[in-house]
Amino acid sequence: MRDLKTYLSVAPVLSTLWFASLAGLLIEINRLFPDALTFPFFSF
């Protein structure tokens, strides 16, 4: 039961950190390449 409580307290923290970093990454990509349908570093 103690392991379950530890899991339930760790999982929201990790998911919050993950989604916050993912949102920040998407915001920075959209700031550097606004309205980009194709990214210049992918087209060779």
UniProtKB/Swiss-Prot annotation:
It is found in: Plastid, Chloroplast thylakoid membrane. SUPFAM superfamilies: Subunit IX of photosystem I reaction centre, PsaJ. The keyword Transmembrane helix applies. InterPro entries: PSI_PsaJ, PSI_PsaJ_sf. GO terms for biological process: photosynthesis. One of its GO terms (cellular component) is photosystem I. It is a single-pass membrane protein. Pfam families: PSI_PsaJ. The chain crosses the membrane at residues 7-27. The keyword Cell division does not apply. Keywords: Chloroplast, Membrane, Photosynthesis, Photosystem I, Plastid, Thylakoid, Transmembrane, Transmembrane helix. May help in the organization of the PsaE and PsaF subunits. Belongs to the PsaJ family. This is Photosystem I reaction center subunit IX.
